[in-house]
């Protein structure tokens, strides 16, 4: 529908032709490609407005994907920054269409419903912002909670059933989780907020692809690594992870898992995941060494040069870790296991796979990160880990 209603949609084809034209020349291919695109448009008599649009798309063809998959879309500052970049609804729509086409055209394995939802969410939120509807955290919080309560009433639960659980959760939980997820978590936890046993629940993802898992247990430094270790042992890939800590010291973590959920035995799969992961968390066995899977022929011959970037976030309270490396089985678990060894806890994990490349982002917290010496040591160990 957006494509059909977009004026001069042929401009998107021009941008698509030039978006990767400068790869392999050295330097930033987006910037170099913008120069080529401007020259082409000028040589072929395009007016300034259309030339600027094509150049904008070529220069920023990776920006929307990176913003949607690596940043927290519940953060008002993220929306402000992205809206300031795109400036107009026309630029936004064009960039959205090009981004979707670029990802889907890369490989069938690269595109999934989760990436589609992230991009659509960013598009709709930014469109509202450009239309004058500036995000209001208080209003967003009220709307999220009201919709979650409405869903809970459909299960014949009273309006105050959630009070004890919700009192332990901070604002960021309600802004980062959707109403459907909040209601799902509440249905399983409201009557056992202070449980001594780990709780693990699984369901088919509402987005229509993959599985969602909820883990609720007393928080521990290596908890995230333990969970990742289990998924790794089952050859399950994490698409997204949202980690929350309640005010009384419990971890409320949710995971989106890539999995073929369209088979007749999916209920048995959900039950098995719940039972096995709960059993692993109860037994608390030592973390097993990661087992790296075989890499594809392309990865062996054209490995991704590993990179690690660790820096304080905008508020200076936590640290943002960005990692780029060749994707392989066991990679995420090996990273989280190393972080646990440094007594660093993961607050948020954004997992992005682009073909053979893994680009993961983590929001971290830990006293060891306040030491510059330990920061350098952690970065060095991560680079060694990521090297093939």
Where are the predicted features?
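Regulatory modules associated with amino-acid/nitrogen control
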Residues: 77, 81-388
